Curated annotation (Swiss-Prot):
This is Exodeoxyribonuclease 7 small subunit. HAMAP family: Exonuc_7_S (MF_00337). NCBIfam families: PRK00977.1-3 (NF002139), PRK00977.1-4 (NF002140), PRK14069.1 (NF010672), xseB (TIGR01280). Pfam families: Exonuc_VII_S (PF02609). It comes from the Bacteria. GO terms for cellular component: cytosol; exodeoxyribonuclease VII complex. GO terms for biological process: DNA catabolic process. It is an enzyme of class 3 (hydrolase). It comes from Leptospira interrogans serogroup Icterohaemorrhagiae serovar Lai (strain 56601). Keywords: Cytoplasm, Exonuclease, Hydrolase, Nuclease. Residues 62-83 have a biased composition (Basic and acidic residues). Bidirectionally degrades single-stranded DNA into large acid-insoluble oligonucleotides, which are then degraded further into small acid-soluble oligonucleotides. The keyword Hydrolase applies. It catalyses: Exonucleolytic cleavage in either 5'- to 3'- or 3'- to 5'-direction to yield nucleoside 5'-phosphates.
Length: 95
């Protein structure tokens, strides 16, 4: 099963990598086959790492975006600056 980076899913790459690792551990390959399997395993590792890095970047971006939204809005979705202005106006009315 030789698939290129753009065509293989994370799950498929990981499954193939696990199969290669198991065969290498059992020494089911000749030396030449072992080298080819190791090379394929390294390709699959890079594919998996790239997919994980992309997912991590997306999560970080979403988290940053969400934290900005959380910091800009109050409990009821009102901006904190509006709430502060209203509170200040109410305090001034008391004095």
């Amino acid at each position: 099963m030789v698939e290129t980076k753009s065509k293989i899913s994370f799950e498929d790459a990981l499954m193939e990598l696990e199969q290669i690792a198991e065969k290498l551990e059992r020494q089911d390959f000749s030396l030449e086959e072992s080298l080819k399997a190791y090379e394929r395993g390294m390709e699959l590792k890079k594919i998996c790492q790239g997919i994980l890095d992309t997912a991590e970047g997306k999560i970080e971006a979403l988290t940053k975006d969400e934290s900005k939204k959380t910091n800009k809005t109050g409990f009821r979705g009102e901006s904190k600056t509006t709430e502060t202005k209203n509170n200040t106006a109410q305090e001034e009315d008391l004095f």
